Regions:
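Short, acidic Gly/Pro/Ser/Thr-rich loop/turn segments
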Residues: 59-60, 72-75, 170-173, 194-196, ...
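Glycine-/charge-enriched secondary-structure boundary and capping motifs
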Residues: 2-15, 32, 123-141, 154-159, ...
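Short, acidic (Asp/Glu-rich) active-site segment that either coordinates a divalent metal cofactor
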Residues: 160, 173-221, 225
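Glycine-enriched loop-and-adjacent helix/strand subsegments that border the catalytic/binding cleft
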Residues: 24
Length: 357
């Protein structure tokens, strides 16, 4: 026995939670910012199935492409809580272009991926404009991207953000760390804050242990705690590329998740370690506060956070003064933070200040 069919409303993609028109509005809001990133090598325009980039480059004799991908991680939760979306785009770009930079590569182009629960054109456009601004500062084209509206998978207002960067370097100028030996000098470039790593611990400290609001003003920071934590990750191509082009940089380290203890050994040859003086650069107030509020041990801080140094260049002792002058002449702050030594039981030895005695 069959029941009578009742009249049913015709379903649409929008009724299922995917608004194509909202996606088109987002593109209209962001397209000028995206086009402003284009380099002469970019072929085609927005809207193609793939981005096109010409590799005709007479300056590089043995071209090697270097790629990197990363996301912003749980820092996004703070951006969502504060309804502030104009800074995380830079975080996304920085996490990839800084990684390819340590190979000696000049960033060429970048692609972003945003997954949202409900597509809000203004929110997505704010994120992508941040991506575009960071691409311009890094000298790379925002060649393409994808915004995926995933109704029922993410909550309304929630989103995830990831990116993919590609750069180029001459094979003879690749920075691999293989030539690092005893007596080389570590030059550190300052960070802007927490950058994009350690935010699971940050949220545990701020929201759970301290029961703070992100809008709480903190005298030591000169701003709210949320504003400080959302300070975008620093982009290092502009300060570092002139050094890479004019000197022999033996190794570079992007201080990300794992801090000093995990990242520095990634570029060191067997048998080589480093000694670092943690008093060689000013420690940012945000790290002092996180340590105090969370009662976090100092070694754990340096294993989790950048502690004020976001990028390290390792150079021959004979080049260190000239590299420091090159940076100073361009008004780039830098600090001699340590040296390479014969490796002992610990590849990374921190000394000075809280590590003395």
């Amino acid at each position: 026995m069959h029941s009578k069919e009742t009249a049913k409303e015709s379903l649409t993609y929008a009724a299922a939670g995917v608004d194509i028109d909202a996606g088109n509005r987002a593109v209209e809001l962001m397209k000028d910012a995206v086009k402003a990133t284009y380099r002469p090598e970019v072929l085609g325009d927005l809207g193609g199935f793939g981005g096109l980039f010409s590799l005709v480059n007479s300056r590089i004799k043995k071209p090697v492409l270097v790629s990197g991908t990363d996301g912003v991680g749980t820092k996004l939760r703070l951006a969502i809580m504060m309804d502030k979306h104009d800074t995380v785009g830079q975080d996304c770009v920085a996490m990839s272009v800084n990684d390819i930079l340590v190979q000696g590569a000049e960033p060429l182009f970048f692609l972003d991926y945003i997954a949202v629960g409900k597509l809000e054109p203004e929110q997505v456009a704010a994120v992508v404009k941040g991506v575009a601004g960071a691409c311009r500062e890094s000298g790379c084209a925002l060649l393409g991207g994808e915004t995926a509206e995933m109704a029922g998978f993410y909550g309304d207002g929630d989103y995830d953000l990831a990116g993919f960067g590609v750069g180029i370097v001459d094979r003879d100028r690749l920075i691999t760390g293989e030539t690092i030996g005893e007596g080389d000098i570590l030059i550190g470039l300052p960070s802007t804050g927490v950058h994009s790593n350690g935010f699971s611990l940050v949220r545990k400290i701020i929201l759970d242990r301290m029961n703070m609001k992100l809008t709480d003003y903190i005298d030591e920071l000169g701003m709210s705690v949320g504003e400080s934590l959302l300070t975008p990750t620093r982009l290092y191509p502009r300060p570092c590329l002139p050094v890479i082009r004019n000197f022999t940089v033996k190794g570079m380290v992007h201080i990300t998740g794992g801090g000093f203890y995990e990242n520095i050994p990634r570029v060191l040859p067997d048998g080589i370690g480093v000694e670092i003086d943690v008093t060689a650069w000013p420690r940012l107030p945000v790290f002092e506060l996180l340590r105090k509020w969370g009662d976090v041990a100092w070694p754990e801080m340096y294993r989790t956070f950048n502690m004020g140094i976001g990028m390290i260049m390792i150079v021959d002792a004979g080049d260190a003064s000239a590299v420091m002058k090159n940076l100073a002449d361009r008004n780039e702050k830098a600090y001699v933070i340590g040296r390479t030594v014969k490796a002992g039981a610990d590849r990374v030895v921190l000394g000075g200040g809280v590590f003395n005695g």
